[in-house]
Curated annotation (Swiss-Prot):
Lineage: Archaea, Methanobacteriati, Methanobacteriota, Thermococci, Thermococcales
UniProt GO molecular function: DNA binding
Organism: Thermococcus kodakarensis (strain ATCC BAA-918 / JCM 12380 / KOD1)
InterPro entries in UniProt: DNA_bind_arc (IPR022889), PDCD5-like (IPR002836), PDCD5-like_sf (IPR036883)
HAMAP family with a match to the protein in the record: dsDNA_bind (MF_00026)
Protein name per the record: DNA-binding protein TK1278
Length: 112
């Protein structure tokens, strides 16, 4: 009886260890995929943005990460669709940022 209980404990422990290792491996793979995607995104941004525009986008990312992510995704989509023919300079990026910010901004009005 005691041997059976000990055997069950060992089996349970091995199952838990196996699950833990599988979860850890899945997390590592997800992190690796995320890092690869970020590297690809950064490479595309280097191709389509001037250094000044990349700098501005980096500063925006510090203050409004959601806005910066939206702009990055939009630019990648346009790039992949072949709609970006020349590098985007700082002035163009400002206009894009303003337009997307205006679209996504919510105005709250408090009525008395």
């Amino acid at each position: 009886m005691a041997e059976d209980i000990e055997e069950i404990r060992k089996r349970k422990l091995m199952e838990l260890q196996k699950k833990y290792l599988e979860q850890q491996k899945a997390q590592e793979e997800a992190l690796k995929r995320e890092m690869e995607l970020e590297a690809q995104l950064e490479a595309i941004m280097r191709k389509i943005l001037t250094p000044e525009a990349r700098e501005r986008l980096g500063r925006v990312k510090l203050v409004k990460p959601e806005l910066a992510r939206q702009v990055e995704l939009l630019l990648v989509q346009l790039y992949q669709a072949g709609q970006i023919r020349e590098r985007i300079d700082d002035a163009k990026l400002k206009r894009i940022l303003a337009e997307i910010d205006a679209r996504t901004r919510r105005d709250f009005k408090i009525k008395w």
